[in-house]
Amino acid sequence: MKERFLVTGGARLEGTVHVSGAKNSVLKLMAAALLAEGTTTLTNCPKILDVPYMVRVLEGLGCSVVHSGSTVEITTPAEISSNADFDAVRQFRASVCVLGPLTSRCGKAVVALPGGDAIGSRPLDMHQSGLEKLGAKTHIEHGAVVAQADQLRGANIHLDFPSVGATENILTAAVLAEGTTVLDNAAREPEILDLCVMLKEMGADIEGEGTSTITIRGVEKLHPTQHEVIGDRIVAGTWAYAAAMTQGDITVGGIAPRNLHLALEKLKVAGAEVTTYDHGFRVRMDRRPMAVDYQTLPFPGFPTDLQPMAIGISTVADGVSVITENIFEARFRFVDELVRLGADATVDGHHVVMRGVEKLSSTPVWSSDIRAGAGLVLAALCADGVTEVNDVFHIDRGYPNFVEDLQRLGAQIERVQV
């Protein structure tokens, strides 16, 4: 049964919220458990829909998975299937991260082309070319990417773009390859670093993690481990922008502020008071935000996943903002929904010009992806009246306890069945 959120605008959000493990990390760590026979335990896992989806994928490959609260235990047998179940994989984009581990462990991988958010083209070209340089043969057939290799061998690999997914699949393939792999122009996102930390805990030989050049010396075997998932910087950033948009005061825990440095700096420019701690931060805003320009870039640039929040705050800011999207070409789809709420926006290619308005007005809107959905809820908090936010299953894929956390912060929001 479909659900929607009813959001009453006008509340000033105040209080403390703690973020759980990162969606963009936990799914890749679960896939990495395929690399070692035995039981790998992940803690601080978020309560989001994509985790059970990944559990289905792993169970379809032959793993035994126990998911209890924020802990996931994955027992990988000596022999696993190389064929990832189509019905499970097509549910979400991150499922493609089993490609590297399966090619490495089984010598073959058949992974259905993934589903996920409608935010633009995200081809697997770099995933395939990376595996091919390691010695695999790859092709697309019957709606799946197929990779085969008798023995992967280390290679020098340069990525044309620092793709997060390609970096992850090359890492998980190279750790058991024969010889040394040097990956140049690798993604530097904190979630990549988290994956490298876990792989090293499993016995991988990796240097340069967190930089644009990663060196992987293949080992014969990895062993299972226990690992705590890093905090979700995108969820944390969402709360930061919620505080600024509602002229509120929110303290966020469970996150390293350095992973959100630029996003928090932008809030300072907009007029917010930002205080950072070892494992969190506080954002306080007592005025209408000032207009700020944004452009999304790979880490350490402004995250594309926070672009909807940047557009959201620009909607109600004092002045004109230009937001440039450099990662995904279709991520401005939700701007039409903001216009329905009264936003003054002009989209021109991969730029959107936002002329801030003092107040938005309620109307039904529809979420098109995880982050756009969250951005619409934040905009609804700034609107007069009650806004219906539809297709909220998108939000549930990436935000644990979203409604409950908002209610604790003072928002008037309820989940209703349609």
From Swiss-Prot:
What the record says about family reads: Belongs to the EPSP synthase family. MurA subfamily.
Q: Where does UDP-N-acetyl-alpha-D-glucosamine bind?
A: 93, 305, 327
Asked if the keyword Cell cycle belongs to this entry, the reply reads yes
Pfam families according to UniProt: EPSP_synthase (PF00275)
Write down the Gene3D superfamilies for this protein, in alphabetical order. Answer: Enolpyruvate transferase domain
Name of the protein: UDP-N-acetylglucosamine 1-carboxyvinyltransferase
What is the first-listed, main subcellular location in coarse terms? cytoplasm
Q: Which GO terms describe its biological process?
A: cell division; cell wall organization; peptidoglycan biosynthetic process; regulation of cell shape; UDP-N-acetylgalactosamine biosynthetic process
| Keywords on record | Cell cycle, Cell division, Cell shape, Cell wall biogenesis/degradation, Cytoplasm, Peptidoglycan synthesis, Transferase
